[in-house]
Regions:
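Active-site and adjacent substrate-binding regions of carbohydrate-active enzymes
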Residues: 1-335
Length: 335
């Protein structure tokens, strides 16, 4: 079968050089994961594309509904549960073939700096290999393309024609395509607020996102509270030897799954637990996690605002995301 062919390819190529390989694989089955990314699997990892096809319609983009926070949460958790400790998925929010993650997974009108950091934290702290796509660390959003001629991607132009055929006018069709087009992830990187975002003095292959005046690297590097600095903090936390056992190797255990628009999970380790929690609501929330009672919780990362975990209750502001270290009373034996 296919796995036999992939193993032959791996034997003749990747394994000879101990190469690290990541597969683009859709519609995988749980029972096949061992063959793909287990200890003797064909690949080292698989990109997690499950979130990118939420609400996908065979009719096309015009029939695709916006992603709700609950859908994102459950899809992420379904993948984490299916993979378990078989191997490590390559976790993404966006890539060169997708629209910008903050525009896809954060409801319109709520794409603040805080919300973007919250989404980044919820994804970055999962079990697996976090991948950052250029511009993600700045919170780059989808581009407001002025016309279909500004879009280069052939599939996006096909979707535009499909929209027109089902009765949408040109403005409506452009709005649909602008939301889903892969060209959103291909606009020039926004280095500063100068012409063309500082990317080039020439003519770029695609238009520069007009938001470059406000969203650019120069305005965020070294600035306390910026999205860029938050991502640096997340990288530093994942590289911290004190938390390696939990964040790198620990299992993911979702909690509060019945709490609408609250996404929370534990990373379990021998030395400590890590609690990652985010509030997608546009208002403050208080949730109860009984196992926190009597335990010391220390904030490791916070996207802004005050946050308390007292007597098993966690208070979150609107669109707040927090990473806690939960200290264990005694060392846990992980099998």
């Amino acid at each position: 079968g296919v796995v036999d062919l992939l193993n032959e390819m791996a034997d003749r190529t990747f394994r000879k050089h101990q190469a690290f390989t990541i597969a683009e694989l859709f519609n995988w089955r749980k029972e096949d994961l061992e063959s793909y990314i287990g200890d003797e699997g064909c690949f080292s990892s698989i990109f997690d594309f499950a979130e990118t096809v939420i609400n996908a319609s065979p009719n096309g983009w015009y029939d695709q509904k916006p992603v709700e926070p609950e859908q994102y949460k459950q899809t992420v958790f379904d993948v984490q549960k299916s993979v378990g400790d078989v191997g490590y998925m390559a976790n993404i929010i966006e890539n060169h073939d997708e629209s910008r993650g903050v525009s896809r997974y954060i409801p319109e009108g709520e794409r603040s700096t805080e919300a973007k950091k919250m989404l980044g934290g919820l994804s970055f702290m999962l079990r697996g290999l976090p991948f950052l796509y250029q511009g993600q660390e700045l919170g780059m959003e989808n581009c407001a393309f002025p016309s279909i001629e500004a879009i280069d991607d052939v599939s996006s132009r096909d979707e535009y024609q499909r929209c027109l055929k089902v009765g949408l006018n040109e403005e409506e069709a452009l709005k649909v395509v602008s939301h889903y087009s892969r060209d959103n992830g291909r606009t020039p990187f926004q280095w500063n607020d100068e012409k063309n975002g500082g990317f080039t003095t020439g003519t770029p292959w695609l238009m520069v996102n007009p938001q470059y005046k406000d969203i650019n690297a120069a305005s965020q590097i070294g600035k306390e509270g910026s999205i860029y600095e938050f991502y640096k903090s997340m990288i530093a936390l994942r590289r911290d030897d004190r938390y390696e056992d939990t964040i790198v190797y620990g299992v993911t255990e979702p909690v509060l799954e019945d709490q609408k628009d609250i996404m929370a999970y534990f990373r379990r380790g021998e030395k400590q637990d890590i609690l990652v929690i985010g509030n997608f609501r546009d208002e403050a929330a208080e949730v109860e996690i009984p196992e926190l009672k009597g335990k010391t919780c220390q904030v490791l990362l916070n996207n802004g605002g005050t946050c308390m975990a007292v007597d098993g209750k966690v208070k979150l502001e609107a669109l707040q995301g927090v990473v806690f270290e939960v200290k264990l009373t005694k060392k846990r034996t992980v099998v």
